[in-house]
Every structure is written in structure tokens, then in C-alpha cells.
Amino acid sequence: GLKDWWNKHKDKIVEVVKEMGKAGLNAA
């Protein structure tokens, strides 16, 4: 289910979100 998918990928997702956040702050 979705929870299993999230648990499998959350570390990578968090890293990507952090990078996107940094890029957004730098662009602003």
C-alpha cells in the first residue's frame, strides 16, 4: 500500500525535497 511505498522511499523523497527547498530559496 501507500504506507509501504512511503516507508521505502521517504529518505530519498526527503533529500529531494530539501534540495528543491534550497534551490527555491536561492532563486528567490
Swiss-Prot record:
Modification sites for Methionine sulfoxide? M20
List the expressing tissues.
Expressed by the venom gland.
Its annotated compartments are: Secreted
Quote the PTM field: Occurs in 3 forms, M-PONTX-Dq4b has an amidated Ala-28, U1-PONTX-Dq4d has an amidated Ala-28 and an oxidized Met-20, U1-PONTX-Dq4c has no modifications at either Met-20 or Ala-28.
GO BP of this protein:
defense response to bacterium; defense response to fungus; killing of cells of another organism
Where does the record place a coiled coil? none
Q: Residues where Alanine amide occurs?
A: A28
Sorted keywords for this record are: Amidation, Antibiotic, Antimicrobial, Fungicide, Oxidation, Secreted
Q: State the protein's purpose.
A: M-poneritoxin-Dq4b: this synthetic peptide has antimicrobial activity against Gram-positive bacteria B.amyloliquefacies S499 (MIC=0.1 mM), L.monocytogenes 2231 and S.aureus ATCC 29213, against Gram-negative bacteria P.putida BTP1, P.aeruginosa PaO1 and E.coli ATCC 10536, and against the fungi S.cerevisiae, R.mucilaginosa and C.cucumerinum. Not active against the fungi F.oxysporum and B.cinerea.
Provide the protein name.
M-poneritoxin-Dq4b/U1-poneritoxin-Dq4c/U1-poneritoxin-Dq4d
What lineage does UniProt assign to this protein's organism? Eukaryota, Metazoa, Ecdysozoa, Arthropoda, Hexapoda
